[in-house]
């Protein structure tokens, strides 16, 4: 029995996971716990949802156009659910835009702050084409294979702008 307990203690000792730097004293723990944090519920269900609703909930026609633009099925779509999801996404984006992180960036150690680099190289048109070629459409999200070619209508390039002269103007008044 005691041999089993020793194995259990030994096993637990070497399987512990750590995240970030360890705390060195109680003051660091108190300082860490005193920092203001966000709750996802506050962000998505707080006052910002009301702001997004005041800014304008997308109409059913706008939701249909967005679904068609994304090549999702429009006929069998749950428009009310899509509207609710759009309002949540808009409120989350608004919250991110309102948050100032400039003061915090000075003290951040990038090794513990982000998984992606902060400064990224600008993409060129050729880089975008390579990335697009590698994208696989997901049938689970309703994307039919080969439904939309994002660069197929761009026939001309001038001053880093891509000119589309056909296809998109069919249903305009």
Swiss-Prot record:
Keywords: ATP-binding, Ligase, Membrane, Mitochondrion, Mitochondrion inner membrane, Nucleotide-binding, Protein biosynthesis, Transit peptide. GO terms for molecular function: ATP binding; glutaminyl-tRNA synthase (glutamine-hydrolyzing) activity. Signal peptide: none annotated. CDD domains: GatF (cd21422). It is a peripheral membrane protein. Disulfide bonds: none annotated. GO terms for cellular component: glutamyl-tRNA(Gln) amidotransferase complex; mitochondrial inner membrane. It is found in: Mitochondrion inner membrane. The keyword Membrane applies. Residues 1-15 form a transit peptide. One of its GO terms (biological process) is glutaminyl-tRNAGln biosynthesis via transamidation. It catalyses: L-glutamyl-tRNA(Gln) + L-glutamine + ATP + H2O = L-glutaminyl-tRNA(Gln) + L-glutamate + ADP + phosphate + H(+). Coiled coil: none annotated. It comes from the Eukaryota. Its EC number is 6.3.5.-. Allows the formation of correctly charged Gln-tRNA(Gln) through the transamidation of misacylated Glu-tRNA(Gln) in the mitochondria. The reaction takes place in the presence of glutamine and ATP through an activated gamma-phospho-Glu-tRNA(Gln). Required for proper protein synthesis within the mitochondrion. Belongs to the GatF family. Subunit of the heterotrimeric GatFAB amidotransferase (AdT) complex, composed of A, B and F subunits. This is Glutamyl-tRNA(Gln) amidotransferase subunit F, mitochondrial. It comes from Candida glabrata (strain ATCC 2001 / BCRC 20586 / JCM 3761 / NBRC 0622 / NRRL Y-65 / CBS 138) (Yeast). The gene is GTF1.
